[in-house]
Structures are given as C-alpha cells and as structure tokens.
Amino acid sequence: MSASKEGKEKKGKLLGVENISPPKDKRPATRMKLLNDVGAGEDSEASTTTTTSRTPSNKQEKRGSVAGSRIKILNEEILGTPKTEKRGATKSTAPAASTVKILNEKKTPSATVTAVETTKIKTSPSKRKKMEHYVLQAVKSENTKADTTVTVVTEEDDTIDFILADDEEVVPGRIENNNGQEIVVTEDDEDLGEDGDEDGEDSSGKGNSSQTKIKEIVEHVCGKCYKTFRRVQSLKKHLEFCRYDSGYHLRKADMLKNLEKIEKDAVVMEKKDICFCCSESYDTFHLGHINCPDCPKSFKTQTSYERHIFITHSEFSDFPCSICNANLRSEALLALHEEQHKSRGKPYACKICGKDFTRSYHLKRHQKYSSCSSNETDTMSCKVCDRVFYRLDNLRSHLKQHLGTQVVKKPEYMCHTCKNCFYSLSTLNIHIRTHTGEKPFDCDLCDKKFSALVALKKHRRYHTGEKPYSCTVCNQAFAVKEVLNRHMKRHTGERPHKCDECGKSFIQATQLRTHSKTHIRPFPCEQCDEKFKTEKQLERHVKTHSRTKRPVFSCAECKRNFRTPALLKEHMDEGKHSPKQQRSSMRSAVKIMERTDCAICDKNFDSSDTLRRHIRTVHECDPDDIFGVEPHPSKRAKKDIESEEVVPVALNTSAGSLISSQTDGNGVVVREFLVDEGDGAAQTITLENETYTILPLDGAIEGEQLTDEAGVKPEAKKEEAQVSPVVKKEQRKSLAASLAAAIADNLEESCSEDDFSGEILTEEDIKLKENVGKLIDMLVDPPILKKYGWPNAPEETVLCKVIENCGHDLTKGGENYAELDYGSRMREYCKLLFTVVIHNDSIKSLLNNFPIDDVIEYVLGDEDQDEGGLDKDNESHSGDEEAVSVTGETKTNEIREKPEKKEVSAKSEKKEIVGKAVDKDNSEEVVRENKKKPVGEQEKA
C-alpha cells in the first residue's frame, strides 16, 4: 500500500498536483494521458526547478506504446491551498495555477478557464527530434464564443498538448485550479466528427453557460500506409483502396538504413542482366499483374513492386530523371536509371505518364495524339467510317481493310514446332508459349494464368464488370471486342464457316469443329459395325448387346420370354394355356388393364405400371392398397365408358369401321358384355326387371337406371341355381343389346375424333404415342395441360395446342400434316416441338444425327427401359397375360367400355365390360359356344 501511495505521489508531483485522499462517496480517480513521450526513458536522477524536483523513472515503459506518461489527478473533498513554490520555479502566465483538481461534485465556476503551466522536463535532443512528427492537441470549446487551448507551457516556450486516454474510463467532472476555476471534463465518442457536438450539448446543458468542455482529437491510423483520419468512416473507405502492404513502411525503414547496400547491389544486378529497380530478369521485367500507379510498368511480386516504388518513385524530388517522370532515391541510382533508358533501347519517355519510346518522334506523336497532350482534339479520323485514331500507322492499317488489302504473314516469323507464320515477332513469342506451356501472367483475383498480358487485361474486365463494347442494334454490352464481332454476325446472318459434309454453316470455327466430329464418329463398337459420336452413346449401345446375349426361354403357346428355365416351367405348370383357364386369364388380364386412373387425384395414365409408379412417388402409398379403393362418386361421374380403351392397337371403333370388308357392308355390330361377378363366395346382383337399362351411363341418377338395393339379396347364390340356361342367355343378350343401344346414342358426344379417326396404329406408333404422352407430362406445366384437356384429350391434340400456343402456326408451314399417317404426323410435331418451341442446341444437334424416336427416348432417359425390363420379370412371376388381341382371321375388333361402379354392399363388386364387334356369323358362333357350356360354368361365368 505504501508503494502504491508513493507512486501516486510521484505522478501527482509531475505537474504540481496535490495528492489528497478522495472521499469515500466519490467516484474513482480520472486518468489523463500524455500522448507524447516527454517523460519516457528519463533517469530518476534528473531534477527540476519546481515543486516537483524529480521526475519518475519510466524505463519500464517502451517508446511507441499507446499510453505515454500518465498523470493521475485525484478527487479532493475540500479545496486546498497551493504549496509554496520551491527554489527554481519557472514563471507562469497566470498566478497560482499550478494545481489541477477533478471534482465529482457539481459547482458553478466563478471564472473562465486559464492556461495551465508546469515546469520543463529535460529531454535529450534525440528524443526531442523523434517526437517532432507528433501533432497532439486537446481543444476545449465553450458554449460562449470564446475558444481557448489547454496547454502545458515549458521553460523554452514549448507546448505539450495532451488528450484524454482512449483505453481508460473517463469520469465526467470538473477540473478546478487554486482560484476556484473549473473545467468540465466530458466523455466523447470515438468518432468525434459525428458525435462530439451532440455529447457537448448534453454535458453543457447540465451546467451554467460559463462551463466549458474538452473535445478529444482521436486519430484513426491505417495499418497499411499509416495515414491518419479523424473519422472511422473515412478510414474504412480508405482501407478499400489502400494499395500498400501492411508491412511496407517497416520494410521501407529497413531499406532506408541499407541505402548504400542497395546502391552497391544495383550495380551488381545490372552486370548480371537484372533490372536494378525491381530485381527481375530483363527477359520478363516490368511485366506482371501488379501495376504501378505512377508509370506503365507492372510487376510479378509485391516485393518487386515495393522495391520499384522505393527506388524510382521517391517522395522527394532531389534526383529527378531528365527523361521520364521518375524521382530516384540517390544520385547513384539516378545514373543507373538514365543508363537503363539508353541501354534498353528506349531513351525517350513521357514526363506525364512515364511511357518510354525508342525514337523521339514517337514521343512527340504520343504527346500530340494521346491523353498526355495539352490539346485533346489532335486526333485522326477515317473518312470512310469516321473511326478515330491517335496514330497515323494505325489509321493506315485500318484503311487497308476498306481497300481489301490483307496483311501478309512473314515467313521469317515462323514457329519451328507447328510451322505457322505470324505477322510480327511479338505475336510469335506469344504463340511459342502455347507449346511450352508457359503462363507468366496470373490473375490476382482468381487462379487463372495466361500466356499474354493482353489476355490477362481482357480477363480482368470480367472481374471488374467493365464492358466497353456495345452492340449498336440491341445495345448489349461486351467486355471483349472479339465477342462483339461474333455477336454482330447474329444480326447480319453471316455464317462464314461451312461444313463440307452436310453443308451446314456456323458463326464460329469452334462450332464447325464440334460439328465435324458428328460426321467422324470416332467411337466404333467392337461387336458390330456401328460408330458413335460420344463415348456415352457407345456405352449405351454396348448395353444392348449384353441384353441380347442373355439366354431367353420362350413359351410356345403365348410367345412369352423368361430368363430361366425354372420360370418357364413354373409358368407352364400354372396351366394358363389350358382351354378352361384361357378365358379366366383373359378376364384377369382385362381386370389388370382396366384400372389406369388414380383413386386419390383422379389422374389418368396409359398403363397400370405408370399408375403404380405415380402412386409410389407422388402419394407415397402402396399401390396394392390404393387399387382396391373406389374413386370418389363425383370423380366417377365425370368418366365416360367410351373414354377407356382396352386394345391400344385398334383405335377405330366406329360402327362403319367395325364391319368387315368381306361382308360387303351387310355386317351388323353386335357387342357382348362380360360381367365379372368375382369369386363364388361374393354376393351377386339378380336382374329382376329386364326392361331396365342397368348400367349407369354419363353419371345418371342411380334410381332411374339400377334396381334398388332390395334387388340385392344375400341368398342370391341359391336362387341362381334355379334359373335355366335359356333364361340366362336371354338376359345376357338383352343386356348386350341395351348397352349397344346406349353406346350408339352417346357415341358422338363422348368419343373424341382422334379416338375414332379410322386409323390403325402399329406397335411403333403405340410406343411413340406413349412416349409423347410422357414427354408432354415432363415438359409442360400441369395447369396448362389441364387447360388443354389433358389427360382426357388425345396426345396429338394437346401437342398441337402446345406448339400453336408458342407462336408457331401449323397451317402456314407449307406442309399438309393431315395427309400423313398418325406416326408421321406425331414425329413431325415432335420435331417442331424441339426446334421451334424449345431452343436447345444440344437437342437440335441430336435431331441432325438421330431419328426423332431415339431423341425422345434420350430426353426421357433410360429409366423407362429399365422399368420395362423389371415389369416383364414381374409379369413372368405373376403369370398374368394379355389375352385381348385383334386377329385378321376372325375379323374381330375389341374395345373395352368402363361403366360407372355402384356400391351395393360392404363387399362391392367391380363389373368389367368388354365389347366385341363381330359380324353376324361370328356373333352366332359365340352364342352357340355359350349354349354348349354346362349350366354350372355358365353360372360361374
């Protein structure tokens, strides 16, 4: 405790401050800091001639620290009398003003603030010189118009200015001298320029008008170039553009100490063919990505750049260059610099920009026609196109383009590697770097490197966003002139690069080279003679060979393929091909093919496999659970019987087309409807009134067309055994007749023109139709598809509407698509979809080399093919087969009509209706076959 008290007494005696213990109810002592190191480093033996006869020793504090010698002024409860001055006291500008006190209590000062005096502290001359560059001031301003400065006056009229310390907490209060005069000490923010006035107003409002405040002058220093700023915002803005490295001034101080050594090393470097100002080889000197702001030279490394700045662009103009705008550091370096102008072949340089030239008239021309000219209008323009030039030789070379004269490549500038000739030596040197792989110019903003400085400058425009070249037609801007020239060819329609094989023309030579590879097909298949353009296409083709090599075991009856003999044997053991099972398998196949609409979202699909995949992916449910759920009645009412097709091969089901050509037009359409009652244990419906139409058509009211629920009897199975086969035959015939009449009445309303266009589709057309449907689902948004009537509308209609909606008129194309068959029409529509609607160059290139069917499958991907293979395997396990077919021998066309479903009891039954259109002979054949069957089989049927 005694040691701390002695320290406080010493600090207090530095300016003659009384150290009186503060009262308990006062705040902690306020600290003030002298930013100039006046008392730093002095010996404890140095004495003064005032009340403070000895200064404290501050050897522990290093010079350059944030805090200099600190003065701690303690609070005083009672105003004390000043001590008597000792021998050797200095003169003061105001009497009895050597004591400064800080009081926490608020008192109104009786007089204005006067200057504070103290004795001089002796400092060595070296220390004094080092402190000359500090400019430290604390300014206090009154609410009145009088402004004074608080200073510490020394013996030799020197002033020691001080400010409040930043790192110590400043307690607001008043400074009072021996005469009772007080100085208000306020707390200012770090940014004085913005917040100082507001704080001053708050503090001054608490006292009288005679109260004053002390403002801090805080200097914010840049850590790179050590430039000071009054505001934080100014410092932040400066840091964005400061080009100096953080340690440049430290290295500059070392170079100043070793200036003589640098001069000796410069002479040695010149003898070794190394540039003395940047220490780079003369082969690639002054060529890099770090540009000098004072001259046109650039450098590869930061060290070379700093050495150049230190030697060539000195802050003093004691040794200026007589040729260029450089200011050398010493006379010896100036001599080397001027010798460099002469020995390196460019003795003439511009005083403004520093660019050097080999001849004097080049310099004069530069000074006349460049931005360094006093008269900026000294330019030369082309009289043909009004283009402006600064050099006469550039104008002459430009005029050769109008005359049609081409610059001839000189054979002396020939590359020995590729035997190409160039216009000049500089272009040859740049070209040689493409063979050697040398890229000396790297971008400082990314990792790219370039073989020429021009390429680096063009690349940097992409980082800066500079686009100096703009199109006069569409005002689109570009960073490189070559890109603009290529863009202009789009407006003019110029395509100078033409393919010799197919005659196609392109804008760029690279596009032609890429296109030529399509004719070369460098990837041949080792197993066949086919060739492919890309390696990916070859890999896809090789997979087809692996699939065909796999052994196939076919069923002799149904021509079905199986992977293993065990699967084939299992298929034969199931007895699917026995006469008794063929009819049930037909009905099971019809049952499988019937359900293609989703019971959740009412969306229709081409096949049950697509429906299953939709349920798994979209609704995330098990398809087996959904298949047993009936759709909502409101959704079922929207579906017509004629909107479903069982046999995709025969789309023409009109009455005229179903009559065989061999009947000479005398055939009659007779439709037979097979009603699947389910297994024998389920409840069945007994037709009690044959005069009723028992199938709900077009969502009619159930009570009008169906028998009521009283017609459904639990004991229906027993009653069925009492019905004779003749009655059942008549009932079945009446049912078929009524259904045929109902369908004929609603045929024109419910069936679309495309479904009954009278065209017979092949298997390829059916596959194309399915792929087009998937393509439409993938490319067009669902709201637009719903607007066009999808999925109820046919694929061809929706595809035509999509193409016409995109602005292409199918009637003005000059082609009559109506004369083509279904497959050709769909292929032409798909080509229009890819070329006119979808602007994709990769798809267009595929169309030039592959048929449209392959392009559609390529767009859809290989997923459908893989799933198709899995579906075949699953079908082989299940043993179900599609038994509905069309044969020319029997002249039979089959379609499926799907009626509305009626829930009769808890175990509702699905009725599946299959219509057969046959002529008279075939219909009688069917009736005779039904007569031959036993009664039990008829009941089961």
From Swiss-Prot:
Modified residues (Phosphothreonine): 186
Region (Disordered): 1-97, 176-211, 864-941
Zinc finger (C2H2-type): 220-242, 290-313, 319-341, 348-366, 380-402, 413-435, 441-463, 469-491, 497-519, 523-545, 553-577, 596-619
Entry-linked SMART domains: ZnF_C2H2
Family matches, as Pfam families: zf-C2H2, zf-C2H2_6
Residue ranges of the TM segments: none
Compositionally biased region (Basic and acidic residues): 869-880, 891-941
Subunit and interaction comment: Component of the gypsy chromatin insulator complex, composed of Cp190, mod(mdg4) and su(Hw). The gypsy chromatin insulator complex interacts with Topors via mod(mdg4) and su(Hw). Upon ecdysone stimulation, interacts with Nup98.
Name of the featured protein: Zinc finger protein su(Hw)
